[in-house]
Amino acid sequence: PLNLKNSTWTLHDDSADSQQLSKDGTAPYSGPMTYQINMDIQEPSDDEKATVRIGETRMRGEGEGLNDLSQAQVWTYPVDRLSGEAAGEATLSHTLATPSDTVTVDGYWLKFPADAEKTNYPVFDPTLRKAVDAVFEEETTMDGRTVYRYHQEIEPTNVAQLFAADGNTTSLPKEGGGEEQGYLTHSGSRDFYVDQQTGLVVGMDMDIDDYYADREGVGRERAFVFNGSTSEEDQQALLKEAAEFPRDRVAEIVRWGAIGLGALLALLGIIGALGLFGGKNKHARSRHNRGRIGGSAVPASR
């Protein structure tokens, strides 16, 4: 089987916003954050499917220890080895000492179909736990390889209306005293840079504006505001891996083997029965859509 050595997508934002847990509850955090995805693909059990484990982490500051950990979760599910499409439900571990969730993974995520086409693909959004179309935008070349860029636009969506989970609601202060319920609202966009031949995602831009809104949908408090792109190092490594896919095997079936987890994913052993949780911007993008506080898009104050 083909062994891929690199399976890490690291995105960094020097001025992100999130919520930080403390003994007194939660408090706003503004500063550097790193969002990282690590993918571990197990040895395939048959000729058609493999099991993937995808760990997501959000780290504050330098991300050097568990105290900097903002969020972590791991998804485990079967995929079609050629298309990359989910072939069954996922087990999601996200909170210490709580049962895992069962989630239907729609569409694709980090692996598009081999011989990708200039069309729209449904791509899984882990915050919404459902797919949102990614629209073909352009063909480009990276390190001599043909790469397609697909753009995914996420309209403001009340996540609490989709499923119940920690963090989907909060308490917001009311004018004149008292509190009211706040609802996590997810919005933003992603751009996926996909190696056309193999379907491997070799780069990603992410501009996320998550906030807590009142019953009328007016943004009141930032939850996770982040703008970053895949690090240069990760992108180069992923392009190299794509280039090493045997051409004849891609035409038949992409034989995914074991992909080593990144060091950060190893930290996630404190969560769930799985024993796992779960740079600089090359494609810098504007923050024009950040900080939807007060019901309109306004620049996030720093």
Sequence positions of predicted segments:
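Membrane-proximal low-complexity regions enriched in glycine and acidic/polar residues
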Residues: 109-205, 210
